[in-house]
Amino acid sequence: MASEDVKTDRRYTKDHEWAQPHAGNVRVGITAFAVDQLGDITLVNLDVKAGDELTVGKAFGTIESVKTLSDLFAPISGKVAGVNPELEHKPELVNDDCYDKAWMIEIVPSDATELEGLLDHATYAELLKTAHH
């Protein structure tokens, strides 16, 4: 992944998820690097619903591809505001538009400083350079 595939308007995790401030909440999805590693997405299973509480690192679902099955983890703590209803019927959206249309969950953050503790775009871009062995 080239560094231009790293959006500057969000934070990142070492697990290749992104967290983007959105109307007072935080939307969560996976990065282009993660999509590239997974291949064609066949199923997105979100195990949470609006009102559920999440803590950092708690699994909130799985993503399945032709290659593998991966867990999805909450990058911040908070209450689930909603899940992306499109992904249940259109998992391929993740391949097509992982940064916008294929957001997975939206969280009402319980601690705004957790978002600041995630990787900024420049740090994440550096991480990607070392991911290419």
Regions found by a protein language model. Give the residues of each.
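Small beta-strand-rich domains/subdomains or short beta-sheet motifs embedded
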Residues: 11, 53, 64, 70-74
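A short, compositionally biased micro-patch
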Residues: 21, 65-66, 75, 110
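Acidic, low-complexity mobile loops and tails
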Residues: 1-59, 96-97, 101-133
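Structural motif
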Residues: 25, 77-79
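Aromatic- and Lys/Arg-enriched surface recognition patch
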Residues: 81-105
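Short, charged beta-turn/beta-strand-edge "cap" motif at the junction between a beta-strand
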Residues: 59-61, 66-68, 86-87, 111
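Residue-level recognition of beta-strand microenvironments
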Residues: 19-21, 46, 66, 83-86
